[in-house]
A protein has these predicted regions:
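Loop/helix patches that line or flank the sugar-binding groove of alpha-linked glycan CAZymes
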Residues: 1-202, 214-215
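C-terminal beta-strand-rich structural cap/linker in extracellular carbohydrate-active enzymes
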Residues: 199-226
Length: 226
């Protein structure tokens, strides 16, 4: 989310593997993704709320910005709300300026964003945003499956935020529409060029014994033959 009190970003709170998994879900969802500047390369700088209004309007904006957090337990004390950066202060703006050299420093996640955005643009399923052609299911307490389709084309996103999972394909009702078809993996956050460890999800076995294995903190996309 953007505009948190101190501008902290999701990747400031979780490790790189989980951030790659969460980013995969965001960028393959049936909606236009809202990206806050710098999140595509895991910027170290905060995403603060800053403004440049005339003095009186600026004073009201600063006051309103701090008052909007008064309902949060962490900011019940007015003195704590005063620690929220002033949107009108130049220092707030300067703290949010991106360091574009971090694109190279965090090349893996930057390439992941580029690759998934290209997939959204060119893939015949992901380029459509109709939610009626999407089914999302919690497959485990920490793994989500997203089945998207368009015409005879099917895509399956498995996003595992937790420990490694071996999932029986035929025993899972959420996979009924794709379980008997050939699966072809077209994306994996484990890809080394994307900052991954090279341990990719895979489908093993056939028929009722078919199992999909998803390593810890990994996401993958499969093209399912129609």
């Amino acid at each position: 989310m953007g505009n948190r009190p101190f501008g902290d970003r999701l990747h400031h709170e979780i490790n790189e593997d989980r951030y790659a998994v969460a980013s995969t879900l965001l960028l393959t969802a049936p909606e236009t993704p809202l990206l806050f500047m710098g999140q595509e390369f895991a910027a170290s700088t905060p995403f603060l709320y800053f403004t440049d209004h005339p003095e009186e309007l600026g004073r009201l904006v600063t006051q309103g910005r701090r008052e909007e957090f008064s309902g949060f337990r962490a900011f019940h004390d007015p003195s704590l709300r005063e620690t929220i950066p002033d949107p009108q202060a130049e220092s707030t703006f300067l703290a949010s300026k991106l360091d574009l050299t971090e694109r190279a420093l965090n090349a893996g996640i930057y390439e992941l964003y580029r690759e998934l955005l290209a997939l959204r643009s060119h893939d015949e399923v992901f380029q459509h945003n109709e939610r009626s052609h999407t089914r999302a299911t919690a497959l485990t307490a920490q793994m989500i499956g997203v089945h998207r389709w368009w015409g005879n084309e099917h895509r399956l996103v498995l996003a595992n935020l937790g420990p490694a999972v071996s999932l029986p394909v035929f025993a899972n009702p959420a996979l009924a529409a794709v379980r008997a078809r050939p699966w072809h993996r077209i994306f994996s956050t484990a890809e080394p060029r994307l900052g991954g460890n090279g341990r990719h999800p895979e489908v093993v076995g056939a028929g009722p014994s078919r199992v999909v294995y998803v390593p810890a903190r990994t996401a993958a996309i499969w093209r399912i033959e129609g």
